[in-house]
């Protein structure tokens, strides 16, 4: 199969993966309106073409939290990454490090912090949820520090799990789900051998290190579901600050008032995000929410954005709307599922190539020169 864009990786991943895994990554909440708008709203933003600008000295490099990034992209935290490729978190982290960008480890990764951090030559980021079991949270923070993690991504838009109806149809949940998953694995032998057999253990590594006595993935997911905390408030972030003195990014901001509160709290960054359309259907796409948030807090806090980014052109659009850096999730996961570490490396090279073309043809020699003047019109204007 010819791979020329991230959408090709999606098609390849759909063929290779058991349906319960593909649709778990691909799906969103409820009727998936926000999931679709994340992509379509970005695609509807027209770039302003400029020519004859002598773009021979173009640079994608940027600085974020005392890190140099080869381009303004980081790999987003994606749960269960190790179910999409053998020891998937390790492979994705290596690809990100090789390209000179951060990898963000999810709380609910298959591989533990201690397995991934030594595999790369730059500090990874770590994502954490607010959970009822504060002992686990403290343990995770201590282990992240010990592993050399510098930047914490604190997810605040998941006090309760979203209603993901597609999971019941695909076999991730619903009637006879375990039997359906076994059958799907049997009918996808390449995945069954590479990940299902050779990718063991299949537990949530960061949680199993804390709980001990592994009992299986379903048990850990059940424990996690019972530990999401709807009482989350800014006081919980104050508690986190007692244990974390490095950069803290608050992920899940869609409103300018919440962004202002993040500045007051003293956060180092925010991620404008609707969790990839996986939490509350009907909320704004990240592209639609970003301009007002940038108007409110740009310069006071670092602004990251995710949800709907499928190409280097989309990265340029998000930067023009006000982001300093973007996170990509599904795009890298499909590449990982298809060709492992090599797939993610190739995807990042595609993103970089697409960004370079877009910057040359919009007259932006550096990331700082990508502004709203790079757009013909903003979304909704």
UniProtKB/Swiss-Prot annotation:
The active site is at 275 (proton acceptor). The keyword Ribosomal protein does not apply. Its main location: membrane. GO terms for biological process: aerobic respiration; lactate metabolic process. It is an enzyme of class 1 (oxidoreductase). InterPro entries: Aldolase_TIM, Alpha-hydoxy_acid_DH_FMN, FMN-dep_DH, FMN_HAD, FMN_hydac_DH_AS, LldD. FMN binds at residues 106, 127, 155, 251, 306-330. It catalyses: (S)-lactate + A = pyruvate + AH2. It is a peripheral membrane protein. It holds the Pfam family FMN_dh. Its cofactor is FMN. Residues 1-380 form the FMN hydroxy acid dehydrogenase domain. Its EC number is 1.1.-.-. GO terms for molecular function: FMN binding; L-lactate dehydrogenase activity. SUPFAM superfamilies: FMN-linked oxidoreductases. It is found in: Cell inner membrane. Substrate binds at residues 24, 129, 164, 278. Keywords: Cell inner membrane, Cell membrane, Flavoprotein, FMN, Membrane, Oxidoreductase. It comes from the Bacteria. GO terms for cellular component: plasma membrane. HAMAP family: L_lact_dehydr. Catalyzes the conversion of L-lactate to pyruvate. Is coupled to the respiratory chain. PANTHER family: L-LACTATE DEHYDROGENASE, S -2-HYDROXY-ACID OXIDASE-RELATED. Homotetramer. Belongs to the FMN-dependent alpha-hydroxy acid dehydrogenase family. This is L-lactate dehydrogenase. It comes from Pseudomonas entomophila (strain L48).
